[in-house]
Structures are given as C-alpha cells and as structure tokens.
C-alpha cells in the first residue's frame, strides 16, 4: 500500500493506493494513480484507474493524473479560464500529448479530479468510481456506473470527447468545514450506497 498525507493552509489531503489482489498474484503493476498539489488555499486532487484489459493501463492512469496537475498549473497561471469546458478540453489535450508516441487505446484509464480555486470546487469525472463533496449540510455525488469489474466503463481513450465527461461546481463557504472524496471503482463499489443515503460529518 502507498499512502501520502500533507497539511497546509488548514487543509489535510490524504491519498492511499494499493494493488489489487489479482494483479498482485499475477505480478502485474498497480494500475491506480493518485496525486495532489496544494498552492495556497487552492488544490487539485486526482485519482485514475487504468482499464485492466489495456496493456499499458498503468501508463494511461499515471498520465491522466499528471495531466490534472498540469491543468491546475495552467489555471493558476491564468493561461486557461477556470470554466468546465476549458478544463475538460485541456485535460484531454494534455493526456493525448503526453502519450503522443503510444497507442491511446493501450492506455485507457478512468479519471476523477477535484479542482479547488477560491470558493469554487470543480469536479471532473469520466468512467467508474465516484466523487463526493460535503459541506454545511450540502452534498454533491457524481453519477456512478453499475458495471463493476467488467472493464466496460467510459474512459480516456482515442475516442474520448468532452461530452463523455461529467462536471459540476460546488460553491464553498471556506469558513466552514468541508470534505471531498474521490475513488476508483474498487472502493466505490463498497461505499457509494452509504454516501447516497447518509450524510458524512467531519
């Protein structure tokens, strides 16, 4: 298991990733990727799961997460506007460019990302897994797919289009506590029902 925790500006960001039992038994690499960066009171948190049937899925997920970090930097540097369409277009472009010498369909991956800029938390999702945000009695939950472990999810691939992404904005009162959670399908399958029917207080 790989874990990372960082504290800054009143934020606590934690990431945990572990290789699945099937991949461990077959001596295959961990296809999950996760990363975050904090810049002042703003941050990006991203998690990606390589689609198991693709031979370079771990590379696809790694570059999906890295693309989120690069897009966050573009936003902070005011190179692109913090609008959903711009963020999604930039993510797709960054992912494709980073894999320019690869067959994109060998590198398929899902993606869940949270971009927090100022008082707006923008969530971006393609494929299975889910994102949940909660603050002051308000909750946001991304759509979920009922195709657990089937390798039949929407994903970053050669045919990916902006309309394949789900996006939403969550407006924060930054003086009040909030929690944000994003995970891949392995965790989502066990938690999504609970998040759908219960408020989580932190």
Annotate each language-model stretch with its function.
Residues 1-202:
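PP2C/PPM-type serine/threonine phosphatase catalytic domain
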